[in-house]
């Protein structure tokens, strides 16, 4: 199978953040090109890694790429959305783990494979499904969702300030004929954005494409579900490393980690906080870890990456 061409972002930092024990049990929730998985596996002796991906392409590639570890019995692939983490691990007899890693960037091959429809740079059928077996696609969102639903996702998931004129333009065009390709959609989005605004702030379709992709794959819902399960799966001293690439995901992770590591509301004047009220988790880094200048120089996709790490302390 052809190479995955996926440059892993914050590779050293995210795996170091897990404080790998050679005998531990670890989960890579986003296998992708296998960069993080390989780095974890290199440090395991009798430990084991469970690697999730809902994209069969990633699993097929890594069956070859990580064959040594597979043959040695150190690696199990799970073709599933990471929102099923607890169910899938329980079915395999795993109820506690030492570390869980999430890399929430769409893997480069999904962007680069024109026919998957993730990219506004290539003309392709409107698709954007991470899991090719699911029914909901970008075509259905663009052609069948109501004006109000489009408005909601462009605002909420794209933070697009021209959401209304863009949704109107889509509505107008699809009344004439279905919108079938990413190229058509890009041109329609441009119609909804004033010419002066199109000259600044990156590609005019970027925010709308992000919004549709998040809606098609229920990315924020899946992340929230998965993180809630992840904290209950961690053993004491276990850690979760999460790499985000956009503000919505980062805000969700930041809020959740803060809630897990904060004291409950207590009456004023308590001199000593009893142990049973102390939080079970602590933030390993209070501010997100960002890519180094060297990494930014070689990987332009790294510029928006942020790494947050949570540790279970009791």
From Swiss-Prot:
<feature type="binding site">
    <location>
        <position position="53"/>
    </location>
    <ligand>
        <name>S-adenosyl-L-methionine</name>
    </ligand>
</feature>
<keyword id="KW-0698">rRNA processing</keyword>
<keyword id="KW-0949">S-adenosyl-L-methionine</keyword>
<dbReference type="InterPro" id="IPR029063">
    <property type="entry name" value="SAM-dependent_MTases_sf"/>
</dbReference>
<keyword id="KW-0963">Cytoplasm</keyword>
<feature type="binding site">
    <location>
        <position position="110"/>
    </location>
    <ligand>
        <name>S-adenosyl-L-methionine</name>
    </ligand>
</feature>
<dbReference type="InterPro" id="IPR002903">
    <property type="entry name" value="RsmH"/>
</dbReference>
<dbReference type="InterPro" id="IPR023397">
    <property type="entry name" value="SAM-dep_MeTrfase_MraW_recog"/>
</dbReference>
<feature type="binding site">
    <location>
        <position position="103"/>
    </location>
    <ligand>
        <name>S-adenosyl-L-methionine</name>
    </ligand>
</feature>
<dbReference type="GO" id="GO:0070475">
    <property type="term" value="P:rRNA base methylation"/>
</dbReference>
<comment type="similarity">
    <text>Belongs to the methyltransferase superfamily. RsmH family.</text>
</comment>
<keyword id="KW-0808">Transferase</keyword>
<keyword id="KW-0489">Methyltransferase</keyword>
<dbReference type="Pfam" id="PF01795">
    <property type="entry name" value="Methyltransf_5"/>
</dbReference>
<feature type="binding site">
    <location>
        <position position="82"/>
    </location>
    <ligand>
        <name>S-adenosyl-L-methionine</name>
    </ligand>
</feature>
<dbReference type="GO" id="GO:0071424">
    <property type="term" value="F:rRNA (cytosine-N4-)-methyltransferase activity"/>
</dbReference>
<dbReference type="GO" id="GO:0005737">
    <property type="term" value="C:cytoplasm"/>
</dbReference>
<feature type="binding site">
    <location>
        <begin position="34"/>
        <end position="36"/>
    </location>
    <ligand>
        <name>S-adenosyl-L-methionine</name>
    </ligand>
</feature>
<comment type="function">
    <text>Specifically methylates the N4 position of cytidine in position 1402 (C1402) of 16S rRNA.</text>
</comment>
<protein>
    <recommendedName>
        <fullName>Ribosomal RNA small subunit methyltransferase H</fullName>
        <ecNumber>2.1.1.199</ecNumber>
    </recommendedName>
</protein>
């Amino acid at each position: 199978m052809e190479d995955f061409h996926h440059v892993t972002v914050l590779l050293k930092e995210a795996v170091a953040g897990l404080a790998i024990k050679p005998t531990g049990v670890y989960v890579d929730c986003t296998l992708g090109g296998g960069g993080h998985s390989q780095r974890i596996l290199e440090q395991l002796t009798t430990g084991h890694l469970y690697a999730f991906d809902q994209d069969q392409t990633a699993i097929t590639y890594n069956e070859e790429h990580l064959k040594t570890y597979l043959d040695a019995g150190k690696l199990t692939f799970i073709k599933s959305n990471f929102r099923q983490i607890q169910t899938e691990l329980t079915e395999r007899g795993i109820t506690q783990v030492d570390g869980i890693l999430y890399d929430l960037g769409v893997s480069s091959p999904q962007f680069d494979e024109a026919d998957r429809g993730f990219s506004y740079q290539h003309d392709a059928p409107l698709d954007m499904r991470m899991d090719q077996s699911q029914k909901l696609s970008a075509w259905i969102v663009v052609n069948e969702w109501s004006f109000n639903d489009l408005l909601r996702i462009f605002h909420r998931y794209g933070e697009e300030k021209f959401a209304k004129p863009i949704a109107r333009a889509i509505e107008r065009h699809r009344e004439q004929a279905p919108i079938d390709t990413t190229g058509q959609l890009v041109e329609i989005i441009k119609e909804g954005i004033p010419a002066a605004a199109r000259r600044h702030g990156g590609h005019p379709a970027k925010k709308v494409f992000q919004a549709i992709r998040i809606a098609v794959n229920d990315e924020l819902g899946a992340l929230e579900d998965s993180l809630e399960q992840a904290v209950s799966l961690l053993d004491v001293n276990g850690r979760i490393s999460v790499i985000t690439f956009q503000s919505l995901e980062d805000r969700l992770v930041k809020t959740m980690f803060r809630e897990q590591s904060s004291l409950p509301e207590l009456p004023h004047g308590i001199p000593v906080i009893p142990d049973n009220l102390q939080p079970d988790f602590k933030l390993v880094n209070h501010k997100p870890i960002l890519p180094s200048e060297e990494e930014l120089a070689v990987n332009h996709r790294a510029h928006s990456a942020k790494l947050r790490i949570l540790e279970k302390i009791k």
